[in-house]
């Protein structure tokens, strides 16, 4: 008798739990989303790089940036400790500077030909691509303040007095 009562109580509890869970999901789906999803870093393949950043195969002797906004390109590897250190910084910067710059990521393990074309020998290597100018390269992990300074001065061309530290 005790086993039957226990089984009935467990069944009732399970049904109640699933019924309550389902109502929450329905109400969440019916609510309009007020949260605006901000852009994060964009992972590039070689083909995407050639279309969005620079077609070095078509113009091997001249740098011609194809983007409509300045960008940072992070050449990284998934096993690299310093790469993992700057990944959340780049994620934050992509949100902070959304609409002003692009932040691209190129996995050097998967895109070896692309990394070789730029002579990437150590990672992370960062390529800062301003509009209408030659890109600038930096190697190694940097603190967020250095990224902010480079973005403001190199990419967005803000004078030092206008840059907040």
Regions found by a protein language model. Name each.
Residues 68-71, 75-79, 122:
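Short pre-active-site segment immediately N-terminal to redox-active cysteine/selenocysteine motifs
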Residues 78-85, 125:
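C-type cytochrome heme c attachment motif
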Residues 1-50, 159-165:
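N-terminal targeting signals for export/organelle localization
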Residues 68-71, 99-101, 131:
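Loop/turn elements at helix/coil->beta-strand transitions in domains of secreted/extracellular proteins
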Residues 122, 127-165:
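Non-catalytic, surface beta->alpha helical segment in thiol-disulfide oxidoreductase systems
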Residues 44, 48, 71-74, 85, ...:
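Extracytoplasmic/secreted proteins, especially bacterial periplasmic and envelope-associated proteins
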Residues 75, 86-113, 120:
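Thiol-based oxidoreductase modules, predominantly thioredoxin-like and allied folds used
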């Amino acid at each position: 008798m005790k086993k039957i009562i226990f089984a009935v109580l467990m069944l009732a509890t399970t049904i109640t739990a699933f019924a309550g869970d389902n109502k929450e999901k329905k109400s969440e789906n019916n609510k309009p989303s007020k949260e605006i999803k901000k852009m994060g870093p964009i992972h590039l393949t070689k083909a995407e790089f050639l279309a969005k950043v620079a077609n070095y195969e078509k113009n091997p002797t001249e740098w011609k940036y194809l983007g409509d906004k300045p960008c940072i390109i992070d050449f990284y590897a998934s096993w690299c400790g310093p790469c993992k250190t700057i990944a959340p910084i780049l994620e934050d910067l992509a949100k902070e500077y959304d609409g002003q710059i692009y932040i691209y990521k190129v996995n050097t393990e998967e895109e070896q030909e692309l990394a070789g074309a730029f002579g990437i020998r150590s990672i992370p290597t960062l390529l800062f691509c301003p509009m209408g100018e030659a890109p600038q390269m930096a190697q190694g992990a940097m603190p967020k303040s250095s990224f902010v300074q480079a973005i403001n001065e190199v990419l967005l061309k803000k004078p030092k007095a206008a840059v907040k530290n």
